[in-house]
Structure formats: C-alpha cells, structure tokens
Amino acid sequence: MPLVIVAIGVILLLLLMIRFKMNGFIALVLVALAVGLMQGMPLDKVIGSIKAGVGGTLGSLALIMGFGAMLGKMLADCGGAQRIATTLIAKFGKKHIQWAVVLTGFTVGFALFYEVGFVLMLPLVFTIAASANIPLLYVGVPMAAALSVTHGFLPPHPGPTAIATIFNADMGKTLLYGTILAIPTVILAGPVYARVLKGIDKPIPEGLYSAKTFSEEEMPSFGVSVWTSLVPVVLMAMRAIAEMILPKGHAFLPVAEFLGDPVMATLIAVLIAMFTFGLNRGRSMDQINDTLVSSIKIIAMMLLIIGGGGAFKQVLVDSGVDKYIASMMHETNISPLLMAWSIAAVLRIALGSATVAAITAGGIAAPLIATTGVSPELMVIAVGSGSVIFSHVNDPGFWLFKEYFNLTIGETIKSWSMLETIISVCGLVGCLLLNMVI
C-alpha cells in the first residue's frame, strides 16, 4: 500500500506540473501534503514534516548554491568565461577544435549553471563553426555534453548537491568519483557522438544572440579566470584526498576538512572573485554588489523547488515509506544503483525537469543506502545520471537546444535527446563498474 500511495503522489505531481502547468515548488508541497495524509499522518505531523524537509534540505544547500551563483555571475560579467574559451581554442587549433570546446565547456561548467554556460558559449560555438567551415553540431554537441555532464554529475551544481545532502554523501568524494566518470562520458557523448551527426548541417540562426562580447582589455587573464573559477573544486578535492590518505589525528586533516567544506570552499572562491573579477578590474563595491544581488535572483525559484523536493522526501521518510522500501530491498537482488537510476529516469522522462526528478528520486531512494550499504556518493551520481536521460518536449532545455541550433524536432531528438541518453547510460555503467572497486 505505501508504494501505491507514492505512485499516486507521483502521478498527481505529473498532473499538476504537466496538465495544469503549476509551479514546481507549489506542486511538490501539495503532493507532500497529500501523500502524508493518505499515509495516515496527523495534520500537525504532516505540516511539521514539510517544514523539516524544506529546512533540512536548504540548510547548507542554500549557502552553497548562493555562493556558487555569485561566483558564476562574476565570472560571466567580467569576461572571465570568454577568456577561458578563447584561450583554449587558440591553443588547440582547428584540427582539435572539438577537444578545445569540451575542455572549455567542462571548465566553464564547473562554475556556471547549465543554461548560463550554454548561452555564454554559443557565440563562441557559432564563430568556430563559421570560421572553420564545419557543421554547427560538430562543435555544439561537445559543448552541450560537457555542460550537461557537469550539471548532472558534479557538485556544486543544484541536482548533485541536493542529492548529496539527502543521501548524506561526502561532497569531496562525490566530486572525485563524478569527475572520474565524467571524463569518458563526455568523450562518448561529445566528440564521438558528434561525428555521427555530421550529416545535420544547419545554418547559424540569425538574431538569437546579442550578449556582450568583451574586448581583450576588458577580460582578466586566462590563469586568473581558471584558478578563480576552480577554487571550490580544488579545495573540495583536497579535502577528499586528505581524508583518504592522512591518518586520523594528523595536524593538517582539520584544516583540509574546514577549507574543503562546500560552504567554506564556495565562500572563499567568492571572496577571491570579488578581488580578481571585481576590484582588480576597476569595478566598485557597488557594482560588485549589484552583480551578487542579480545572481541570487537566478536561483531563487530553483531553491524553492529543491526545498519542495526536500519536503516530499521528508514526508516519505516520516510516514514510514522508507522502512517499507528498505524491507522490500531485503527480498530483491536488484542493484540499488540501478533502482535509484531507474526511478530518476522515469521521473525525468515524465516531468522534464532534471532537478525535480533528481530531488524526488533522491527522497524515494534514500532508504536503499542504509539497507544495502552502497556508497552514497555513487548513489548521488546514479540518480544524477538517471535525471538527465532522454530530454524531450516537456524539458525547456530541449527547446533551448532546438532553437539555438536551428533544428527540427526530429533532429533535436536525434542530437540533444540521444546525447542526454548517452550521458545517462554511461553514468549508470560507470557507477556499476566503480562500485566493484571501492
């Protein structure tokens, strides 16, 4: 019966979001309320569970996402992202242009949300395709693959970070494992798959992009741009490595754990960026503060939706669904990684939103960790992989890709939807293989 109620809740969520076009946050809270009542929870307990779910999920997550958005916005506004892109492409040359685009997308993707990175790199992709006389998708697909993998696999992006919070996974290890799996995944979904699509040769659409192009003097140096944007990654990776190789009681371990905490790592990066991307570029504190304020507007609704997913998750836990799923897992031989991936994949195809699919699947799959002893970090990547599968017409990202690359719906499915599916399947296979050795 508990699983039937969960299924009803998921169907209700789909109806509210797809049929009635309801805001994701409101829909998630209403579904959490409905599932709690159907499970027989008292009214006051349901409300308390929803509050606890929102608060527990957004506790440190709001700080991480807030600081991450600030870092990304400063990187974009000062021309740092453009500097990274143009320098890498100049170094690689036309023959290896796909790899330059992949590396650029991967580097930029660490600091920027997918949509921001996508729009930011488009002029560069258009310029490369025109100057090298190559099909647009030949460089567009590697760019999209790199951005999508960082968005689905790696903290501090919203989906992986929120799932890591739900699963109580170590952010540093999640980042480390995610990076290991991301590299072959990007290669297959990007440069390799792009060669299959060389027959789709569409002209660059006119009038779709009018963002600022920075002059040489306006942009910070390549080294400053790269190292400032990668500060959180370096600090979190340092913590993960220190915890693996240093004995307990080592003097450096507390320092590494403090500096590598995701909140501290992103805060330190923002403080450095305020100087390297702001004061050092001649910007006033008022201008820097305007950038910081505008960055939060970008993620405000995203934070609420994630909080709503946390509320749904908490109701499932407090109503006993987690224990029911845990008991079921004792009677099945299905890999918890495969099950978590499948839940996220079904929700992704039905809902369209990778973030909502990831958060909802995280709440449903959370009991599997305690029951099976599977690595919570690999579970984060499994859910993240499932949440990006087969983007189609109910996903805004589908239409973003279609319009900017001047494609038909069929061509978008062949390129974008299949690209996302390759990423999803590679992520699952990678998790299953990595699970054998850790």
From Swiss-Prot:
It is a multi-pass membrane protein. The chain crosses the membrane at residues 2-22, 23-43, 52-72, 108-128, 134-154, 174-194, 222-242, 258-278, 292-312, 327-347, 349-369, 370-390, 418-438. It holds the Pfam family GntP_permease. GO terms for biological process: D-gluconate metabolic process; gluconate transmembrane transport. Keywords: Cell inner membrane, Cell membrane, Gluconate utilization, Membrane, Sugar transport, Transmembrane, Transmembrane helix, Transport. It is found in: Cell inner membrane. It comes from the Bacteria. One of its GO terms (molecular function) is gluconate transmembrane transporter activity. Part of the gluconate utilization system Gnt-I; high-affinity intake of gluconate. Belongs to the GntP permease family. This is High-affinity gluconate transporter.
